[in-house]
Amino acid sequence: MSTRSKWKKYIGLAGMLFLFPLLWLVFFGVLSKHKFKTLSYLGPENTLAEDPHYRIPDFAFADENGNILTRDSLLGKVWVAACYSTSDEHIAQITERLLNINFKYRNEPDIAIVVFSTRCESDTPESAKAYIEQNTQYNGFSNKWKYLTGNQDAMQAYIRNGLLIQDLSNEAIFKLIDADGHIRGEYGNTEYHFLGGAGDSIPGMVQDIALLKKEIDIRRYNERKAKEAATTQP
């Protein structure tokens, strides 16, 4: 076999090796229904379901700027609910964990962190605002990290009955809320509490936030396509 024939043979084999996975991706991407991993829904008593069966109730608490934040004002965003106080003994460790989330998604307007104060009497608007400004100075968008205070009894009742966090002494529990107000994950200090999760709490939460952000992107894509189809119909 001549050298030219050998080269043609090698080029042909290389082309087949490249073309086969490409055709496989096209076949399964176009002819099959695309699915991606998503998260279950978390309800009272840590019950899990594939369909939404619990939605956090509405709330109305003042943020660090004195503006009222509600559940409905967060619809359309994926957000982390954290419960602690700026006067907590382990505030540095708690903040460090949330800073990882904040920095990872600092340029994503659809991702937010919301702190529910566990000591409303000591968390003044001034201290809350200073805390937020210090930790969000590199954010690409404002209002990505909110600090809520208000009536102490009302706040604690909401944390227990709304966010389903019974132990208010454990500041290291975070809840992941999707764009519709459903709880999709619970994360602890070092242990990843949510069943079927991705591992360690913060890396696991980073991955899970990406999954819920994908849900938003797919929903918007489908809505845009439906709108385009409606406008092109005779």
Question: Predicted segments — roles?
Answer:
Residues 169-234:
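Thiol-/selenol-based redox modules, centered on thioredoxin-like
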Residues 69-98, 113-114:
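Short active-site neighborhood of thiol/selenol oxidoreductases, capturing the structured segment around
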Residues 1-58, 232:
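N-terminal targeting signals for export/organelle localization
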Residues 54-56, 168-171:
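Short, small/polar residue-rich loop motifs at catalytic or cofactor-binding pockets
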Residues 60-61, 176:
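Hydrophobic beta-strand positions
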Residues 94-148, 152-158:
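Structural microenvironment flanking redox-active thiols in thiol-disulfide oxidoreductases
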Residues 85-87, 116-120, 144-145, 191-196:
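Second-shell loop/turn segments in exported
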